[in-house]
Amino acid sequence: MQEYKKNRVSKVAFAYCMALLFMIIFISSTFFLTSKRHIPNTEKDQYALALRGSIITKDNFTITSSKQIYRAEIDLRSINKDKFDLFLKLFQIYSGISNDQVADIKKRMQNQKKRSYNFVLLQNLDSKQASYLKDLAKKLYIQGFFKAFTNNSGRVETRGLNIIEHEEDRIYMSKDSFTPIIGYTKMILDPESGILKNIGVKGLEKYYDACLSPVQNEKIQGLKDIGGNIILNLNSLQQKKINGCDLYLNLSLKLQKSIEKAINQRNEDLKANEIIVGVMESKTGRILALASSRRYDPQNRGKDLSVLNASAIEYGYEAGSVIKPFIFTTALRLGKIKMDEVINTYGGSYKLGRFTIKDDHKMDKMTMEEVIRYSSNIGMIQIAKRLNNIEIVSGLKIFKFGEKSGIDLPYEQKGEIPNPKRLRDIEKSVLSYGYGLKTTFIQLLAAYNIFNNDGFYITPRLAEKFYQNGRFTNLDDDVKKEKILSSEAAKTMQNVLINVIEKGTGKKAITQGIIAGGKTGTARIAERQGYTSNRYNASFFGFANDLNHAYTIGVLVRHPTKPYSYYAAQSALPMFKDVVDILINEEFLTPIQDNNQTSTNN
């Protein structure tokens, strides 16, 4: 009986012990499941920045593009110190860096603050280097080269070698060519990816920024393994990268470079503040070249901010005698003058208020056509007297002076034309030969194009089309075409301008087999204290045609400092001739083989 009781007590005690054990296991399990656990974070978002589009010339040269730039980082807690020399040797082999760069990495490591674990091994890696190093990182992870550690949040992780895309590099292959019209960009932080990207600031980069800018970054979202790599499966999210558009220009690289070279050579002699040259296809408004002597490398811009401006559209100036054909045409269109009419030019000297106006060609009388041919200021004053204030100002407005041309560049200035209500007689007189108004180079180019385009005004355009989503989109919808003059009036003025070159002030531009016309213009530069005696702008605007092609050409020489070069016939006109010769050499023009051709060599 006593033995039985003893066995029973033992069984009860065992049961209580087992119950207590199960309770301890249950409580421990509950605590473990509900407590903060030191396990790796299992989710990850990974971005790749979509790139800004390229800019491509008419002759299919990519002059601007973007590329991804990476950096290599490592968390120093992921690697044993005794393995670091081996790691650096492998890093050098895969990245292709020099011994000096390896030495620099070691030196920076020695100066690294003790509490700073994240260490940048190398910056400015290209895509090829990044690809090789990503392969190295994967191999080292698989081989267990990197060790796990507990981070500041109490989580266990293995970071190892990390290759990070950190910025988009904008590359200008043509260096300073096409500047300032191509413009430049600046970097900002993309809020989604945390990567530095480019936005347009000036020129075509600014005007077409919405098109060139990337549409959608690449995004991969999903669970990650212990090495930090995203596990791609049905539950992971993949968002496709959509880059910005590729912009195709009307500008020709070969023609642009040839004209820029000619500008440089000419300016070695003229010592001008700037020379601007534009070539426009007369029938379409397409700008084939728009060059300046004030160029810069968009990737290495200097401190002179004025160089960054596109003077062709941003610089307003009094143009001088190149305005005469528009006042002349207005009077002709309104029936105020006749082409066969003879006008008094007072022997080349005329009193205007307290000033005496003198002509270079001193003649008692001139035909109306000779007023333009010999650029008579006195003749233009007589013509202006026949126009009232509203007629003369409205005539300028018809040719789009005082409004933007609509060219595809930002920050275009519209110029200034006088208020007819406040225009005094003396102001109207000087207006007739190009003083008292402000215009821009591109306004004059577009206005002269009317004479070479059957009386039609057409918007000048630098870009032709863009490519995106597998298709081209033409930009012709933004081009405005408007009949300004009758065909007869345009033809009359075209012939008048041809005579300027063949018989008048433009003889230096005569080119055998090419139909060329245009007008010189020399004007003093206005400053705060008035007009200076030694600062001038010289211009020549006109056209050059063969049997099948027609081009409108403009030249502006800003403040040439060579003695007597301020006369347009000594500066802008020879530059015009250079451009015509280039157009022939580059096969844009073919001289007419005709014994009856009126143009002859000098």
Model segments located where?
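Periplasmic/cell-envelope proteins involved in peptidoglycan metabolism and beta-lactam response
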Residues: 1-300, 390-400, 509-512, 528-531, ...
